[in-house]
């Protein structure tokens, strides 16, 4: 009996150690790239070309609201920017065509200068950054095994268990976990689990009899 308990404890310790080691390996791969860490901390994918982005020329409303926004913000310091924008939009609609005309003329002048300075400019709206998830899914057996380990630190193991599947939280091709290394670790964990199950059945005849009865006489 003590031999069975010691064997089970040893198997549990081996599995826990392998999972923690796998988590540390993933964490190291995640933090060894300073460029990737910078993108992760700032929440964006900044490139050198983004620094020289050409701003879109102002339209009539932008010319008018440039000073009005500052005025409303000074008069209402507690008002949020979204509320200020709503108020400015309402005030702009209430203006007459004669009141709007000077701002349309100023906007045309600004746009003409912009075309002269940037003749090849084309407006391209920026797309929202979408986090890139790894296209590699770990096996369901390994995922369920990780879900059963309640003591794995989330800081060490950047995966989420959902519906028997595990998806890596890395972004970018250079940050993805090496598939061959992950496969070796998964194979090792599965072998350890199979070895522990076989050892427990071999040392416990009652459990073995129940398992055989379940296999031959399914419900």
Curated annotation (Swiss-Prot):
UniProt DNA-binding residue ranges: 54-122
Keywords: Activator, Calmodulin-binding, Cytoplasm, Differentiation, DNA-binding, Nucleus, Sexual differentiation, Transcription, Transcription regulation
Keyword field contains Membrane: no
Taxonomy, superkingdom: Eukaryota
Pfam families noted in UniProt: HMG_box
A single cellular component GO annotation: cytoplasm
Cystine pairs: none
InterPro entries for the chain: HMG_box_dom, HMG_box_dom_sf, SRY, SRY-related_HMG-box_TF-like
GO molecular function per UniProt: calmodulin binding; DNA-binding transcription activator activity, RNA polymerase II-specific; RNA polymerase II cis-regulatory region sequence-specific DNA binding
Subcellular location: Nucleus speckle; Cytoplasm; Nucleus
Family matches, as SMART domains: HMG
Family recorded in the similarity comment: Belongs to the SRY family.
Quaternary state and interactors: Interacts with CALM, EP300, HDAC3, KPNB1, ZNF208 isoform KRAB-O, PARP1, SLC9A3R2 and WT1. The interaction with EP300 modulates its DNA-binding activity. The interaction with KPNB1 is sensitive to dissociation by Ran in the GTP-bound form. Interaction with PARP1 impaired its DNA-binding activity.
Record-given protein name: Sex-determining region Y protein
Organism, scientific name: Enhydra lutris (Sea otter)
């Amino acid at each position: 009996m003590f031999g069975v308990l010691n064997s089970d404890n040893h198997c549990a310790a081996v599995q826990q150690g392998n999972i923690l080691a796998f988590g540390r390996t993933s964490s190291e791969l995640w933090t060894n790239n300073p460029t990737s860490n910078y993108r992760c901390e700032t929440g964006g994918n900044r490139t050198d070309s983004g620094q020289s982005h050409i701003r879109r020329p102002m339209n009539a409303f932008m010319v008018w609201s440039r000073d009005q926004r500052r005025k409303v913000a000074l008069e209402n310091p507690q008002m949020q920017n979204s509320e200020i924008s709503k108020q400015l939009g309402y005030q702009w609609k209430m203006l007459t065509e004669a009141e709007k005309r000077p701002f349309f003329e100023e906007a045309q002048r600004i746009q003409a200068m912009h075309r002269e300075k940037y003749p090849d400019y084309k407006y391209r709206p920026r797309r929202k950054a979408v986090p890139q998830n790894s296209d590699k899914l770990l096996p369901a057996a390994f995922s369920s095994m990780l879900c059963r380990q309640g003591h794995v630190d989330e800081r060490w193991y950047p995966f989420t268990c959902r519906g028997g599947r595990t998806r890596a939280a890395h972004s970018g091709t250079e940050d993805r976990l090496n598939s061959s290394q992950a496969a070796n670790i998964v194979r090792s964990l599965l072998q350890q689990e199979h070895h522990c199950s076989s050892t427990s059945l071999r040392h416990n005849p009652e459990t073995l009899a129940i398992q055989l009865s379940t296999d031959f006489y399914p419900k």
